[in-house]
């Protein structure tokens, strides 16, 4: 076990990116984005990085892509979600889990989303588990920020979930958000610059349509929202999620977030 101690614009009302001309002219380091399906895409997160001048370095270890030995030449790394489990025995799951040690040791920004969050939790010795009553969270659900999140303001009240497993909070981590639903732990921070969320801030309207249209069996699971609530929920809640994501990524990419 690794042991460490130590679809667009939520910019401004005018639609301008909050970046000075000189900052735009400076070359930015690429961001590693780890995806888990052949045709998956990073949604709003990928769009944000492109819009703000960060090249995308997309890796799919499941299909044989190597992960960088160091993040010296990257601004950080994001591991997104997927249909597999952090408890699966597949080699790429082991590779990704152990690789998270690179940003942790180098104190580079890391952001785990859904499966990515669960991989971080597993790396740090926490449990990733199925609900004892076989409940899932699929759709929009309420969350509540908790604890001192000094520079993570404007948390959304409702977020998009698509998972059947949850995680315990690792020892030494700071809880950032909880819920009263089937899986109470929704976000945590660890160490210098690692953040994990159980929900999907990257989800676009097109992805909501695609996920719900292609997986009707998932919507029949205990606790899942009906399809029309996914659509209505996205229209109602996605703008606030994008405001939060924009503010978060601006600070995250610069390694400026402090948790006090």
Show where each model-derived region lies:
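Cysteine-nucleophile active-site neighborhood
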Residues: 74-75, 79-148
């Amino acid at each position: 076990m690794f042991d460490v101690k130590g679809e667009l614009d939520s910019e401004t009302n005018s639609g301008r990116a909050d970046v000075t001309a000189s900052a735009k002219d400076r070359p930015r380091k690429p961001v590693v984005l780890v995806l888990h399906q052949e045709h998956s895409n990073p949604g709003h997160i990928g769009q944000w990085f492109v819009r703000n001048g960060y090249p995308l370095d997309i890796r799919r270890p499941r299909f044989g892509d190597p992960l960088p030995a160091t993040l010296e030449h990257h601004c950080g790394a994001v591991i997104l979600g997927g249909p597999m489990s952090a408890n699966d025995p597949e080699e790429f799951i082991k590779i990704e889990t152990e690789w998270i040690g690179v940003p942790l040791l180098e104190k580079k920004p890391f952001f785990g989303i859904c499966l990515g969050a669960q991989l971080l939790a597993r790396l740090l010795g926490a449990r990733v588990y199925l609900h004892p009553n076989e409940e899932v969270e699929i759709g929009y659900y309420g969350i509540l920020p908790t604890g001192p999140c000094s520079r993570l303001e404007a948390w959304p009240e409702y977020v998009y979930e698509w998972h059947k497993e949850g995680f315990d909070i690792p020892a030494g981590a700071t809880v950032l958000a909880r819920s009263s639903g089937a899986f109470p732990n929704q976000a945590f921070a660890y160490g210098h610059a690692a953040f994990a969320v159980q929900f999907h801030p990257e989800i676009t309207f097109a992805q909501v349509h695609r996920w719900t249209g292609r997986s009707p069996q998932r919507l029949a699971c205990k606790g899942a929202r009906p399809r029309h609530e996914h659509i209505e929920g996205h229209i109602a809640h996605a703008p606030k999620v994008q405001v939060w994501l924009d503010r978060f990524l601006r600070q995250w990419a610069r390694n400026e977030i402090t948790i006090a």
